[in-house]
Amino acid sequence: MSNPMKTALSLVPMVIEQTNRGERAYDIFSRLLKERIIFINGPVEDSMAMLVCAQLLFLEAENPKKEISLYINSPGGVVTSGMAIYDTMQFIRPPVSTLCMGQAASMGSLLLTAGAKGHRFTLPNARIMVHQPSGGFQGQASDIERHAQDIIKMKRRLNEIYVQHTGQDYEVIERTLDRDHFMTAEEAKQFGLVDDVIQYRAETEKEEKD
């Protein structure tokens, strides 16, 4: 069975630009990177995290003050991979705006809410889902116990991050994330995961002027 992500990447269109040195071809994502736009599309895992972190660091080196836009359509994925992206977003100097298109579930929702305050958006028909981390481990009893303790620590840390970025009390976050909790765009705004629901690009431009 073919990998749908690989199939999609093989169909990435090329953009041809005219320069004073002739024609130059870019794949569409490289061209958007020139506009300081980064995509998180699909499951969050190590190779994706490496690419996203590298792009964030490159754009910081290029201009440490100009905003970076992070577009998210992700079902979530590996916690450590997502935390690498999260930490890099907080580490770099440029503000990072986030926009959910399609869905931001699990780790995707954490990256969505981790954007710069006032610059976290979602499109009106996007879906946001939050929940506690999950995982499995096989081995001897003492090792299983240690892994269980570690995932409880990770759960606590993730809850603290949601508290920091949403403004909700810890108890509210813990209760909300206890099971898969789905939100509409408006519900995510009311919860504090995003700052606004936008339908047209002009609305984000107005936010920037304000």
Swiss-Prot record:
EC number: 3.4.21.92
SUPFAM superfamilies xref list: ClpP/crotonase
Membrane-spanning intervals of the chain: none
Keyword Cytoplasm among record annotations: yes
Cellular location(s): Cytoplasm
Molecular function as annotated in GO: ATP-dependent peptidase activity; ATPase binding; serine-type endopeptidase activity
Protein family: Belongs to the peptidase S14 family.
Name the UniProt record assigns to this protein: ATP-dependent Clp protease proteolytic subunit
Species this protein is from: Bartonella quintana (strain Toulouse)
Taxonomic placement: Bacteria, Pseudomonadati, Pseudomonadota, Alphaproteobacteria, Hyphomicrobiales
Gene: clpP
